[in-house]
Amino acid sequence: DMVIKSDYIPKPGETIIGGNFYTFQGGKGANQAVAAAKLGGKVTFVCRVGDDYLGKNSIKKYETYDINTEYIGIEQNEHTGVALIMVDQRGENLISVSSGANSKLKIEDLSFLEKKLLNDDIVLTQLEIPIDVVKYLITICSKKNVKLILNPAPYQKLEDKYLEKVHTITPNITETKYLTEIDITDIDKSKLAAKKLLDKGIKNVIITMGSKGVFFMSEDEMAHIEAE
């Protein structure tokens, strides 16, 4: 991830002077893997990286968190996935992703799951990898009764027959609008959108709303957590 912080995000055609510039180990999948490892989880990370400094350095970094990297493939003649991120003073962001090696992940790379997945495992995935791989993951997790958490970003269309098998979904307000056709302008709209996703069969809905915090809904619970 390459991040520039500024007072506001520029409009199309506008150039502004930004603030601090940062580079981080990132990617939604990598962030999820590291967070789970920090919380004490036994984590296996499956992805593809490029045959470059960023990819090799990333693998070394994951291993410092005791993440199992045996299923990380190195893709020849491809760059490691990169995200360019602009963040304003409220924490709102604008992101463009160049998938690189991430786009080369194949269903065959996940064939080990047929034997390795256990009932008490949890699978986290997002949409920075090919959509057919995501559909395979959802299907195999449902078949083996394994909970799957989906971060539906960057948005790609998933048919309801796949969404109904998702245990937990974590869209932001933009992705929620794509999924439900409801524009999230307040908590009441968040409730309507979350209910629509629950009606599709998803068990838990967590809508991230930037500076407005996080909204959670399940069949029998609901909460709004303010941003700090």
Language model segments and positions:
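Glycine-rich phosphate/adenosyl-contacting loop at the front of the ribokinase-like
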Residues: 1-48, 53-67, 226
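Beta-strand->loop->alpha-helix junctions that form or flank phosphate-binding loops
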Residues: 20-22, 46-51, 69-80, 151-153, ...
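Conserved phosphate-binding/catalytic region of the ribokinase-like
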Residues: 157-160, 187-228
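Conserved phosphate-binding/catalytic loop of the ribokinase/pfkB sugar-kinase fold
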Residues: 48, 70-75, 85-122, 127
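Short beta-strand scaffold segments in enzyme catalytic cores
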Residues: 82-86, 94, 213-217
